[in-house]
């Protein structure tokens, strides 16, 4: 089935916005570290790689899925994306971006008290913003149960979180409390790039997340494959490729993303072997095309993300586990310097 012309046009527009968000966020960090005057010589930082892994998801969320009553807690390390989006929406100024992480500039992490743009939740300490969305949703239900604000539409309380934020104990306390109180209208979107400050995430962790959330009454949506990968899986030999992707360790996948198409080709052919149709699937693509296919994880595919968001037509809590690449779209994607 061919996509409708309007859908294709919308995706093209969103792709252009995604490119602008990634560029602005990366430029903001680069300017703070390498262009702006630095009198003490200290590194400013800014988490370019962590921002890049969420650029697609945040583009889909802010420019397609959000409703006026929704509120969002942005993971701290994606603050540059947030400021870039607010700039494109006319709610942030260029001088604030140029003074990112400086006095009276855009803040390192979204702040309701210090930022000029439209911050819903301060998320300066990892894990706290995530829990805030859950308790805000419970508070919304409490207020409505007492007869206040019923004329206003209900909002979804949405958290954008890094996979390593799920190491924070307060998150699990919140999940338990949500189950006790009948949590509704809460989305948690996990940026599953499988890298943290000092490590690659343990294999199979997503399955434990999935079981945990489902046991506490959440729906779980895993967004693993992008449109290119899904189309390739439908080709002869595609199922073998999908099985290889599912078996591939996180550390190896990260290394191959950085090494590029020739490395992908060698590893795939060495491990899958000459099996006719799947070999043809690989060999008919150039190195550039093969790298694009293998890097096309669900969290970087606008169509896949939008399908996941649009597919929710209920008020049950939802956890989206979106596979992403740290530093996606930047030269140092998955280079192994996990905290760059």
Residue ranges and their predicted role:
Residues 155, 182-186, 217:
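Short glycine-/polar-rich loops that comprise or flank the Walker A/P-loop
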Residues 9, 13-21, 25, 29-39, ...:
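Cofactor-binding active-site loop characterized by glycine-rich and histidine/acidic residues
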Residues 71-75, 185-193:
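Short internal beta-strands
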Residues 5-7, 192-339:
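Long, well-ordered, tryptophan-enriched scaffold segments
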Residues 161-164, 190-191, 322:
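Active-site flanking residues adjacent to catalytic metal/cofactor-binding acidic residues
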């Amino acid at each position: 089935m061919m996509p409708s012309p309007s859908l294709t046009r919308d995706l093209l527009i969103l792709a252009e916005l995604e490119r602008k968000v990634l560029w602005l966020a990366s430029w903001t960090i680069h300017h703070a570290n390498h262009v702006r005057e630095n009198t003490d010589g200290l590194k400013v930082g800014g988490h370019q790689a962590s921002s890049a892994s969420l650029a697609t998801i945040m583009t889909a969320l802010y420019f397609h899925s959000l409703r006026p009553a929704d509120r969002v807690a942005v993971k701290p390390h994606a603050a540059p994306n947030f400021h870039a989006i607010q700039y494109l929406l006319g709610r942030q100024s260029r001088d604030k971006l140029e003074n990112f992480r400086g006095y009276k500039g855009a803040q390192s992490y979204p702040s309701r008290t210090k930022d000029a743009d439209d911050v819903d939740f301060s998320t300066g300490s990892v894990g706290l913003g995530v829990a805030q969305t859950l308790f805000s949703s419970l508070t919304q239900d409490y207020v409505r149960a007492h007869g206040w604000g019923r004329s206003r539409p209900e909002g979804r309380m949405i958290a954008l979180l890094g996979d390593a934020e799920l190491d924070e104990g307060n998150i699990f306390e919140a999940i338990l409390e949500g189950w006790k109180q009948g949590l509704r209208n809460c989305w948690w979107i996990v940026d599953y790039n499988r890298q943290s400050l000092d490590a690659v995430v343990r294999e199979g962790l997503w399955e434990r997340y999935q079981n945990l959330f489902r046991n506490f009454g959440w729906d779980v949506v895993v967004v693993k494959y992008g449109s290119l990968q899904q189309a390739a899986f439908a080709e002869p030999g595609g199922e073998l490729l999908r099985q290889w992707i599912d078996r591939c360790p996180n550390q190896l996948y990260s290394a191959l993303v950085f090494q590029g198409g020739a490395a992908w080709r060698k590893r795939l052919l060495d491990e899958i072997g000459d099996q006719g149709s799947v070999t043809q699937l690989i060999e008919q693509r150039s190195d550039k095309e093969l790298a694009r296919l293998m890097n096309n994880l669900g969290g970087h595919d606008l169509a896949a993300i939008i399908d996941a968001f649009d597919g929710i037509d209920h008020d049950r809590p939802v956890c989206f586990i979106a596979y992403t690449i740290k530093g996606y779209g930047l030269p140092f994607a998955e280079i192994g310097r996990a905290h760059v």
